[in-house]
Amino acid sequence: MDLAANEISIYDKLSETVDLVRQTGHQCGMSEKAIEKFIRQLLEKNEPQRPPPQYPLLIVVYKVLATLGLILLTAYFVIQPFSPLAPEPVLSGAHTWRSLIHHIRLMSLPIAKKYMSENKGVPLHVGDEDRPFPDFDPWWTNDCEQNESEPIPANCTGCAQKHLKVMLLEDAPRKFERLHPLVIKTGKPLLSEEIQHFLCQYPEATEGFSEGFFAKWWRCFPERWFPFPYPWRRPLNRSQILRELFPVFTHLPFPKDASLNKCFFLHPEPVVGSKMHKMPDLFIIGSGEAMLQLIPPFQCRRHCQSVAMPIEPGDIGYVDTTHWKVYIIARGVQPLVICDGTAFSEL
């Protein structure tokens, strides 16, 4: 208000000065053109000047922050389109809940106990007869009645003769068998700190972890200034990442080129079993609970049995996908963190 009033008073004085100059010019016999020229020169020399800003440092800081924010926002929108998309075959297909009920509806019937007690479950190791076996037997169901006299086709021997093995970590085999499906119960789930560290270090290998831009930046700072995929970043050593995230793999018989693909975050479906996620040959449950479903190829269902069993945090599974279709169904109330990969090199 003081500045505006000051400007008004200045212009009033200038107006009085111009009138006085005009009268004096007429009295001295000056032409109108000469008077206007003299007034113009007078106004140019006496133009009021605004005072400098009172807070120059604050204005500079404001401009720097605005420029930095604009640069970060531009970089985010430039880099985001280059982020790798989710692989289509994995975790992209959803089967109806009727398919799940079709394969496991016999589990609650008394006749299912008969099939589970005919040595088709988990084989005992030597010396295990005296100790109580953990309660994680797989559930076997027959889609079709098997004819023992009918010869087994060559492409069905893998699922007909190699049944799923479920074992503890100390019972893990020393030699890797490619055709033998197995679930190793390590009892070592991923901690929340390990998951957060993985999200910051390898954002390219994660999917489904919904988190705001600033929340993710604040959580990863200062360990990583910009926790998002860089298009110019070198290809990840996924074999090293697998053993870094799950050190137990250094003691397991999997090939050295076994690698991690992605880690997913899944919410349990409102209807249990309404969505089945297709998996590759290697998978690890980081946290949460799920149901594992193994389905043989259609042409082998007269000779092979479907398998369904619950799996827990820390469970490591391997299944040869040439003889089985592998599905995971999230269950329980806690979100499911599951990592998938492959036991063999892609080359």
UniProtKB/Swiss-Prot annotation:
Protein's organism: Pongo abelii
Post-translational modification: Glycosylated.
Organism phylogeny: Eukaryota, Metazoa, Chordata, Craniata, Vertebrata
Protein's cellular compartments: Golgi apparatus membrane; Cytoplasm
GO cellular component: cytoplasm; Golgi membrane; midbody; nucleolus; plasma membrane
Main location: Golgi
Functional description taken from the UniProt entry: Exhibits histone deacetylase (HDAC) enhancer properties. May play a role in cell cycle progression and wound repair of bronchial epithelial cells.
Membrane topology: Single-pass type II membrane protein
Protein name, as recorded: Bombesin receptor-activated protein C6orf89 homolog
Subunit structure, interactors included: Homodimer. Interacts with BRS3. Interacts (via N-terminus) with SIN3B.
Transmembrane stretches, start-end: 59-79
Cytoplasmic face residues: 1-58
InterPro entries: BRAP
Domain of life according to the entry: Eukaryota
A biological process term (GO) from this entry: positive regulation of cell cycle
Topology, Extracellular side: 80-347
Keywords: Cytoplasm, Glycoprotein, Golgi apparatus, Membrane, Signal-anchor, Transmembrane, Transmembrane helix
